[in-house]
Amino acid sequence: NYPTQDSTMDKTFANNL
């Protein structure tokens, strides 16, 4: 579960992985 404010950042990070 990702926080709303960090969702974009987390998705980008996950995409990098």
UniProtKB/Swiss-Prot annotation:
Its EC number is 1.11.1.7. Binds 2 calcium ions per subunit. Binds 1 heme b (iron(II)-protoporphyrin IX) group per subunit. GO terms for biological process: hydrogen peroxide catabolic process. Its cofactor is Ca(2+); heme b. Transmembrane segments: none annotated. It is an enzyme of class 1 (oxidoreductase). GO terms for molecular function: lactoperoxidase activity; metal ion binding. It comes from the Eukaryota. It catalyses: 2 a phenolic donor + H2O2 = 2 a phenolic radical donor + 2 H2O. Keywords: Calcium, Heme, Hydrogen peroxide, Iron, Metal-binding, Oxidoreductase, Peroxidase. Removal of H(2)O(2), oxidation of toxic reductants, biosynthesis and degradation of lignin, suberization, auxin catabolism, response to environmental stresses such as wounding, pathogen attack and oxidative stress. These functions might be dependent on each isozyme/isoform in each plant tissue. Belongs to the peroxidase family. Classical plant (class III) peroxidase subfamily. This is Peroxidase 7.
